[in-house]
């Protein structure tokens, strides 16, 4: 289920994004990006609609994923 990120308190959203960035081992290519840059990238992707905030009933967890990968 997609969670509308706009309805979350700013601190809650920031904490979810930071948690996501910390557990993702994404390779950013030749130039490593700072934690702050990664957080800003994820926030931008949520704002643009490229990424969505998702609740998994099966795992009882919240995750962030590319919108094109989300299946209801």
From Swiss-Prot:
Short name of any one Pfam family annotated for the protein: UPF0270
InterPro entries: UPF0270, YehU-like_sf
Family: Belongs to the UPF0270 family.
Alphabetized NCBIfam families for the sequence: PRK04966.1
Name the UniProt record assigns to this protein: UPF0270 protein YheU
Species in which this protein is naturally found: Salmonella agona (strain SL483)
Classification lineage: Bacteria, Pseudomonadati, Pseudomonadota, Gammaproteobacteria, Enterobacterales
């Amino acid at each position: 289920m997609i969670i509308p990120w706009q309805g979350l308190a700013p601190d809650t959203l920031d904490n979810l994004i930071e948690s996501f960035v910390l557990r993702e081992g994404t390779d950013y290519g030749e130039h490593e990006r700072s934690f702050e840059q990664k957080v800003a990238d994820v926030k931008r992707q949520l704002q643009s609609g490229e990424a969505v905030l998702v609740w998994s009933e099966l795992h009882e967890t919240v995750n962030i994923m590319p919108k094109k990968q989300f299946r209801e």
